[in-house]
Amino acid sequence: MNYKTTERLEFHELLQYFENHLMQQIMPFWLENCLDHERGGFNNCVNDDGRLISTEKFLWSQGRALWMLSSLYNDFDGDPKWLELATPIARLLIDKGRTPNGDWFFSLNVDGSPKKASDRKSVV
């Protein structure tokens, strides 16, 4: 469904457009390329063809992925697969994401250990 930028759309048309884009493009890309089934969490440093360019796991991305999957379950279709996919991300955040004083780490290494700011390299 392609629209010209000058075309006026009804709300239900916009909603359908974005639902289709989410479910036919974004989620399949994420599910195929970004979930870390071995260690939990979400690989957010991938290029447009899905190639992993860094294994660093940024906590804000973990939270975003957790929210998206939970929201799909709670607000979209109630499919239990969304909770199954969200659970390892939640587990990573709960088990590895916090400092001893309760703050959140900025990012984690592939093994779940905290990434030191001095070890961070640009992925661009």
Question: What annotation goes with each model-predicted range?
Answer:
Residues 1-124:
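Glycan-recognition and catalytic cores of secretory/periplasmic carbohydrate-active enzymes
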